[in-house]
From Swiss-Prot:
Protein name per Swiss-Prot or TrEMBL: Crossover junction endodeoxyribonuclease RuvC
Source organism per UniProt: Rickettsia conorii (strain ATCC VR-613 / Malish 7)
Places the protein is found: Cytoplasm
Subunit and interaction comment: Homodimer which binds Holliday junction (HJ) DNA. The HJ becomes 2-fold symmetrical on binding to RuvC with unstacked arms; it has a different conformation from HJ DNA in complex with RuvA. In the full resolvosome a probable DNA-RuvA(4)-RuvB(12)-RuvC(2) complex forms which resolves the HJ.
Family: Belongs to the RuvC family.
Reactions the enzyme catalyzes: Endonucleolytic cleavage at a junction such as a reciprocal single-stranded crossover between two homologous DNA duplexes (Holliday junction)
Free-text comment on the cofactor: Binds 2 Mg(2+) ion per subunit.
InterPro entries: RNaseH-like_sf, RNaseH_sf, X-over_junc_endoDNase_Mg_BS, X-over_junc_endoDNase_RuvC
Amino acid sequence: MIILGIDPALGSLGWAVVAKETAQLKYLASGIIRTNSKDAIHHRLAFINSTLEKVILEYQPNMVAIEETFVNTNSVTSLKLGYARGAIMSLIGRYNLDMREFKPNTVKKTVTGYGHAEKDQMLHMIKLLLSGTALITNSDEADAVAIAYTCLVTKNY
């Protein structure tokens, strides 16, 4: 089972690929997709879409796990995040992949044991739980690993 975890965002989207081979979890890859805030939104969404498509084609995930989003007090920010999620979900649908959504607190509790863990705690635990993640320093990337990890350990596939 190969899971593509996504921490959705318009400016700095985290992605990670984690596999389950028999009883062992294996970190395969991760990264950040950054878009330029000066670019038109449709160009930013197209860039996210095309970059994630390359990840899907390279790693052939069985499923995508994505973080659920909360409605921000800033409606413009929430709307832009909704655009990014829509572009991602359209791509997931185009490749006929299954998708699971996880609340941020569920991911934090699964990884750290505490549903309100800070970003540095998440990063620390990801490095302990999955070998190969020692070089990850970006919290968006670590969150994507945590989302994929949560999908696999909760057997939500």
